[in-house]
Structures are given as C-alpha cells and as structure tokens.
Curated annotation (Swiss-Prot):
Belongs to the purine/pyrimidine phosphoribosyltransferase family. Xpt subfamily. Keywords: Cytoplasm, Glycosyltransferase, Purine salvage, Transferase. It comes from Bacillus cereus (strain ZK / E33L). This is Xanthine phosphoribosyltransferase. Pathway: Purine metabolism; XMP biosynthesis via salvage pathway; XMP from xanthine: step 1/1. SUPFAM superfamilies: PRTase-like. Coiled coil: none annotated.
Length: 197
C-alpha cells in the first residue's frame, strides 16, 4: 500500500535492526485519514470472505480494526492484555509473548461476544515473530469460530512470523512488508501485483 509505505518512510523511525517506531501515525498518535484508507484496503482484500467479526488486540490494533469493520459492516472485539473488573469470568485466554515489550501477557476475549457462528478476520498493527497472531488465533479457535485470514498493517518480513502463519495455511495480507531495517533505513519487499479484471 503505497500511501502507508510513504508514511513509514516519512514519519517512521528505525530504532534498531529489529524495531521500527511508528508512533507518529499508528501506535500512539493516530492518523485517522490513513486509518480510513487502511480500513478500506483490508475490506477490499477480504470482502469475499463473509466476515462476521473482526478480532484484534489492545491497543494498537484497534484503530485499523475499527476502520476495516466500518467498511465491512461488522463488529470488532479486542483481546484485553489486562484483567478488568467488569470482565472476570467466562473468558477465552491465551498467553502471548511481546517482542517489543519483552514480556508475556495473558490475553482474553469474552465468551459473550464470539462463538462458532462467527467468521473472523484478525487484524493487528505489526507482524514480527507471530506471537500476537497465534494468540489471537487460539482465542478464536477456543470459541469454535472460523478464521478467514489475518490483516497486518506492517509485516517485518525478515522475522519468521509471516512464514510460520502461511505455512499453516493461514491467509495473511500485509499492507506494508519490510525486508530490512538495517543501516537505519527501511527497505520494503518488492511485490508484483497483478490487476484483477
């Protein structure tokens, strides 16, 4: 997605060979116009999948998930990383290791909002080692719902998360795929796309 790649190049900051800071438009301050375009792109890519619900993880996945849900006309449920006083019982739970924060979180979804009738699109801001996506998949599978695919805003293609998911037969659609963050520079995977007529 060209507009996203331009935003990454202009406003993203490479902190190391593994870490890209995009807090200027995605995971702290949010650019709503960009999020709207991201939502439209996810909706376009998954429109034939009969999505009934979008699942994401708090907090950076919420904005792109909501915009995609708006385009698809479905609801969003986000996995919580912390226990809530209002959500104590009747939860699906999975453990997720955060590459960025270097910690393991228990994530949870209420059983009241997802079930076997749902066809789910998982959306997240980043895909690195795949732990968040695998945790979200576990929650969806615990509910008996089916997974239509995973939409990722930025994939670090030099890490193995995307490869692991695709090897499991999961459809992964990434809007920006980064080949490298070496030498303080973002290098994108060159994708050849065929026009569908």
């Amino acid at each position: 997605m060209k507009v996203l790649q331009e935003k990454i190049l202009n406003e993203g900051k490479v902190l190391s060979g593994d870490v890209l800071k995009v807090d200027a438009f995605l995971n702290h301050q949010i650019d709503p116009v960009l999020m709207q375009e991201i939502g439209k792109e996810f909706a376009k890519r998954f429109k034939e999948e009969n999505i009934t619900k979008i699942v994401t993880i708090e907090s950076s996945g919420i904005a792109p998930a909501v915009m995609a849900a708006l385009e698809l006309g479905v609801k969003v449920i986000f996995a919580r990383k912390r226990k809530s006083l209002t959500l104590q019982d009747n939860m699906y739970v999975a453990s997720v290791y955060s590459f960025t924060k270097q910690e393991t979180n228990e994530i949870s979804l209420s059983r009241n909002h997802i079930d076997e009738s749902d066809r789910v699109l998982i959306i997240d801001d980043f895909l690195a080692n795949g732990q968040a996506a695998l945790g979200l998949m576990s929650l969806v599978e615990q509910a008996g719902a089916s997974i239509a695919g995973i939409g990722i805003v930025i994939e670090k293609a030099f890490q193995d998360g995307g490869k692991k998911l695709r090897e499991q037969g999961i459809r992964v659609e990434s809007l920006a795929e980064i080949a490298s963050l070496d030498n303080n520079a973002v290098t994108f995977v060159q994708q050849e796309t065929a026009e569908v007529k």
